[in-house]
């Protein structure tokens, strides 16, 4: 190409014959390697492993892999969101169940306590009645016959 000529868009650096250490590498690979080398030189957070891993593949493959990674992350986030919602629902159901069970047991406890109070009151009334009856009672423990003839009438 002569000075002042407009370059032909069909002619690329990779299609021109060249001599030197870069001969035989496609232009996209060289461009990508130069970009990564510049990023690495500027001190970005690319490790040598990442640099070596990406430097051997064309930009489209890297972009496709990044898209795949993004898609995988998106699917994982979505699955995690669904799992978290399920977990919250189970926890809420368990809490509701335990709350209802607690209320039921409290009611049962209250009923049993009132029943205990009724029985204590009835017992107290029976004790009072028994104490009132004792002075007038005909049957005494000393006059009860032995168990040999429990049905025989008493002699008095």
Swiss-Prot record:
Q: Which residues cross the membrane?
A: none
Which parts of this chain are annotated as the region Disordered? 56-95
Q: Which domain of life is it from?
A: Eukaryota
Annotated stretches, region: Basic motif: 72-94
Alphabetized CDD domains for the sequence = bZIP_ATF3
Q: Name one GO biological process term.
A: regulation of transcription by RNA polymerase II
The protein's matches in SMART domains, at most eight in alphabetical order, are given as: BRLZ
Report the residue ranges that make up the bZIP domain in this protein.
Answer: 70-133
Return the annotated region ranges for Leucine-zipper.
98-126
Which key words tag this protein in UniProt? DNA-binding, Nucleus, Repressor, Transcription, Transcription regulation
Cellular component GO terms held in the UniProt record: nucleus
GO MF annotation: an example: DNA-binding transcription factor activity, RNA polymerase II-specific
Does Transcription show up as a keyword for this record?
yes
Q: Where in the cell is it found?
A: Nucleus
Q: Which family does it belong to?
A: Belongs to the bZIP family. ATF subfamily.
Which PANTHER family does this entry report, sorted A to Z?
A: FOS TRANSCRIPTION FACTOR-RELATED (PTHR23351), JUN DIMERIZATION PROTEIN 2 (PTHR23351:SF10)
Q: What does this protein do?
A: Component of the AP-1 transcription factor that represses transactivation mediated by the Jun family of proteins.
Q: What is this protein called?
A: Jun dimerization protein 2
